[in-house]
């Protein structure tokens, strides 16, 4: 111990050390409260290495992690939302859009890309929950239809990662219409016998769960994802009964047959590639499953900062 450490108390030294740590280097798990190294968490696809809690992931990060590196090409980026109804609740809709676009650096709540998955051509859509709760707008519907049309043109499968609170109320019937519009587009994909895999992440609710999210040839979910139409509290107040433990979580839905499979995020890429290879009569991907995340993955030189 140095002479300065003998003079100063431990709390003063700890506070000084913390003050020198750049913001965003560390984060805390929403489930277990473990302090995690931000860069390591990103490498682990936002899955806590201690309790395996699947945190929310941005649409663009998910797409880049899922598709083969260098194969990605964005679709529908020119489509932008408009406040046709001049809607206003506690805030103008155009102001909500501007705030969401600034916060997420996205134009709307769905990002679509075409690319390759283990060398297989595929079109992938992913919801951005941070953009007004991933709500389904007319642009979201248009981009999803664009994804279907690209899959039809390329004669390839479609994968969609859902994370949404439902229809966007600020667009009224134009938003609700997207439920029918996206469902009709998927019917065209089914007629061509092209696979559609829907991946339900936390949360997938409302009009999205009642349309495109549950229409997959395979409906896959991440662990402990909240999936349903109305929230548990609303249902309890309506039926005036206590709901079962874990109601509307992916494990409960799998047990009741509402979904087909639960897949951990680090294993998602290979598992879906394997399923798509079977559905399209292609050779199975040969890469091994990603290694399990290590709970001691924090670099040694940062251990004293936890």
Curated annotation (Swiss-Prot):
A zinc finger (C4-type) spans 29-51. Keywords: ATP-binding, Cytoplasm, Fatty acid biosynthesis, Fatty acid metabolism, Lipid biosynthesis, Lipid metabolism, Metal-binding, Nucleotide-binding, Transferase, Zinc, Zinc-finger. SUPFAM superfamilies: ClpP/crotonase. Pathway: Lipid metabolism; malonyl-CoA biosynthesis; malonyl-CoA from acetyl-CoA: step 1/1. Its cofactor is Zn(2+). Belongs to the AccD/PCCB family. This is Acetyl-coenzyme A carboxylase carboxyl transferase subunit beta. It comes from Sodalis glossinidius (strain morsitans).
């Amino acid at each position: 111990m140095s002479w300065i450490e003998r003079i100063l108390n431990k709390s003063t030294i700890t506070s000084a050390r913390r003050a020198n740590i750049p913001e965003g280097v560390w984060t805390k798990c929403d489930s277990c409260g473990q302090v995690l190294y931000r860069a390591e968490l990103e490498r682990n696809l936002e899955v806590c290495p201690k309790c395996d809690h699947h945190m929310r992931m941005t649409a663009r990060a998910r797409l880049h992690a899922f598709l083969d590196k260098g194969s990605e090409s964005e679709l529908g980026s020119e489509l932008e939302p408009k406040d046709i109804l001049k809607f206003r609740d506690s805030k103008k809709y155009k102001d909500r859009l501007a705030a969401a676009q600034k916060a997420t650096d996205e134009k709307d709540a769905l990002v679509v890309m075409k690319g390759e998955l283990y060398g297989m051509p595929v079109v992938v859509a992913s919801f951005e929950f941070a953009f007004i709760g991933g709500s389904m707008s007319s642009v979201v519907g248009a981009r999803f239809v664009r994804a279907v049309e690209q899959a039809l043109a390329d004669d390839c499968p479609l994968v969609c990662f859902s994370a949404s609170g439902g229809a966007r109320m600020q667009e009224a019937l134009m938003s609700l219409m997207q439920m029918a519009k996206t469902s009709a587009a998927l019917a065209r994909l089914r007629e061509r016998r092209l696979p559609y895999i829907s991946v339900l992440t936390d949360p997938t609710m409302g009009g999205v769960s009642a349309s495109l999210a549950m229409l997959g040839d395979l409906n896959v979910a991440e662990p402990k994802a909240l999936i349903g139409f109305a929230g548990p509290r609303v249902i309890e107040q309506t039926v005036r009964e206590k709901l079962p433990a874990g109601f509307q979580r992916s494990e409960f839905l799998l047990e009741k047959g509402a979904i087909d499979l639960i897949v951990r995020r680090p294993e998602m890429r290979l598992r879906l590639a394997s399923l798509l290879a079977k559905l399209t009569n292609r050779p199975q991907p040969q890469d091994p499953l990603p290694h399990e995340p290590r709970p001691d993955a924090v670099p040694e030189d940062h251990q004293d900062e936890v």
